C-alpha cells in the first residue's frame, strides 16, 4: 500500500471518529432527568404527559383543574371522576375538605400518592387514632404488581437500571376495601383502597410510578392503569394538575446523557 493511500485511509478514519465524537457531544446535550418529577408538561421519564394525553383522548369528557379554588364548579357536579396523580405532593385540610365535598356529592376521587398516610388521614371518614400507622414502606429494587390481567414487575429505574426504591403500602385494614396489591419477598401488600363516602367513593393508590411515561408505555402497565380507572369510572374526568401543588420531590438523581425514547402505545 503506497504512502499516499495510507494517509488517505488514516484521514478517513480520523474523520469518522471526529464525526462520532461530535455526534456523541450533540446527543449529550439532550439530557433527561431521572428523578421522580411527576409533571405533565414534558417528556421526562417520570413525567405524566402520556397518561394525561391518553385520558384526554379516552372518549370521556375531560377537564383540567389548575387547583381547587380558581373554578369550583366541579363541586356542583355528580357522577364524575377526579384524578390526581400527586407523586410526592401534599394538600392541606382546606383542600381536603373540598375534595370530600366533591366525593359526597356523588363523584369518585382517585389519588395516587407517595404521601399515602397523610392523604388517608385527611380524607378518610374512618375513625383513626392519632398514633395509628396508616401506611408504611419497604425498600426493594423490584416488586410484583397484581392486575386483573395477571402480574408484572415494576421497578424505579435510573439510566434504565433498577435502583432501590421505597414502595409505599397501606397498612390500616379497618373501614377500607382493599382493591389492589403488590408482592415483595413473598408477601402481599395493599396499594389500593376504596371507601364509600356519601353518594361517591374515594380511591387511594400508593404506587404512582405506573402513571409515569417510562412505565405507562408498556402494555402490562397500560392495561393495569385502565383497570384502576375502571373502578372509579365517571361521565367526566376532572384532571387535577400536579403542578398546582408543592412538590417536595423524591430522591434526586443526576441526569443521563443517553437519549431516552418514549414509545407511545397504541390506544386500545
Regions found by a protein language model. Give the residues of each.
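Second-shell loop/turn segments in exported
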Residues: 37-42, 86-88, 214-215
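An acidic, glycine-rich "communication" segment
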Residues: 115-187
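Aromatic-Pro/Gly-enriched surface loop or interdomain linker
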Residues: 2-73
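Soluble non-cytosolic domains of exported or imported proteins
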Residues: 42-46, 89-93, 219
